[in-house]
């Protein structure tokens, strides 16, 4: 097997007298091993690579490391530095004769990935980049590049004893490797830490984008100078041809794909033919640059940068990103790992070179960035964090190093040293940034403080005129399209009468997990400049779920504004609470983490992580919170249209602040002409009320009585039922008696002598409280939907201030 000119050079070469592997086997029953044939072997290799890299990513997740760190380490572990030292493993799993197929797939994945990276870079935004980002990018590039050139003379490749034709390419490769910033990895770190849309994040991304483009230009120069050339004019022809290719693409590509984009209306599926044309154009661009002598990935990157951004590019990303990121790209890390032999780093000089490279990379990047950032009047702490962020390495670093090694510019030892440097600099980025710059402190100066410490300027008015002037704002959170119908019916009921609907506003938030997919980062970059989700007034770039919710709201008279919150599920509650705080909402409604299966009459847990989200929102919310347990509310035949809308609502009132808030919310619904409200007041016997209650509970009971008395005088739309119970069995019977409705409203922490004595059972959902758990359990066979309400006890907007009921202070 010969050496590839522009492809990759396997670390373990196949002897020329060894025959190429056949594609498929006849099976083990014919005495043939699948490991001796190319196709079954590459399947095993892909599965092994994915299993190892994903396992490492899971282990590194608590340290909030980007997945690229796990993939680089996984490639090294599968290579000669670890498992590759086992001869039987190397000869059976990664034999030299199989590497051509694996290398081809890896480079195909790399080519498509660089196309996706190019799509993340918006030339329009770069044209608007301020002098601050340009200055920081220049300083963060030039100083480490210069220090990299000086450092390169500590390596034998730059000495006089080396190949003189390789000295200049080696110096450039070293300079690029030390000065490059991994744009994609940086974006994911910033998004993970919720810094992507802050001032610091925007400066970092703009500077990294400029850095990335400059690095690719320098890399193209280094590649054109490297290689075995028969004539000294060949590098010049390669360079000129590369420039001509870029100019031709700049003139042709945008026009062609803008024409195609106009033929694909937004909101409609993109035709298969257009997607094939786009992908073939990417492959042909890679073929062209490979034929020129640069590298195939350079053509794909140029196509991505010049590709018009919009719904057409979004559709292409959606179609290919999972295959590329999940299966093909990890193969490139393995091919890199098969070339990385850490055992070649031996002796004091070798380890000294490693330390020198790490110090040079960190010092040059951080000092260069900090010095210029301070001149641009960026605060010292933010300047240091900016320098650390700009020092992020990743896949682009590996690409530079692998091209250098494939073209015999870098030796095995130098290659291993540079790979370890890339891992170290990327690994330390997240912990240093977290130590210096807390995500909770990243709001703009004009935004003041975080939602946890802010006190609302709005006050709850006790006078009737003040209540009429106050607008009720509700934040609705959606997990999937199944939440649309039940939430829309709740919102239609909550809008109240025709007189109050003008003072009712709904904010709908689609909860989306932040992933390693490029589309996630591109969506995060569309949020507002202060780090909070952008509330979409023009309905642009909305998710399918929010668009469907808005379409459903048109049948009603509800005013809806939408947003898509993209965060790690562990911190997405911060987006919910921050948005509720910034919009001064009085109520947040969350979907239950289980979905109701109507045929089986049972719950199914789809995403258990959402239970933790609901708990954290209950703990940190700046307003009242409701959890909607949907058991067919969206399945009935009642339309959402205002003219013929009907909903039967029952409120179970035991006592306490949460029950009072649930009752007030029910009264708001009762203002709607299509809502029938029944309030069931459940109390214990007089002996239990006076003999068993302590002083504080007696005070709460008195507050409940005052509250109910005042409401009965002013609430004409509700029917009140009073029930006195002597045992918990009677409580269960009353609940069964009144569950013949569309939805039950209960408080999360209901008070009263009977609540504490409800049947003891395994509490699977503490966020629902004792009454909510009882209703959704098998103890009561019912399919009624439930809204569990928790009142906000701090200072801020409340549902109480939005309806004509008295405000009762909670002790």
Swiss-Prot record:
Major localization class: membrane
Keywords: Antiport, Ion transport, Membrane, Potassium, Potassium transport, Transmembrane, Transmembrane helix, Transport
Record's bilayer topology term: Multi-pass membrane protein
InterPro entries associated with the record: Cation/H_exchanger_TM (IPR006153), CPA2_transporter (IPR050794), Na+/solute_symporter_sf (IPR038770)
GO biological process, one term: potassium ion transport
Tissue spec: Expressed in leaves and roots.
Compartments where found: Membrane
Alphabetical list of Pfam families matching this protein: CHX17_2nd, CHX17_C, Na_H_Exchanger
Entry's transmembrane regions: 33-53, 68-88, 99-119, 136-156, 167-187, 207-227, 233-253, 266-286, 287-307, 315-335, 354-374, 384-404, 415-435
Disulfide bonds: none
GO molecular function: antiporter activity
GO cellular component, as recorded: endoplasmic reticulum; membrane
Function: May operate as a cation/H(+) antiporter.
Family that this chain belongs to: Belongs to the monovalent cation:proton antiporter 2 (CPA2) transporter (TC 2.A.37) family. CHX (TC 2.A.37.4) subfamily.
Name assigned to this protein: Cation/H(+) antiporter 16
Organism for this UniProt entry: Arabidopsis thaliana
Gene: CHX16
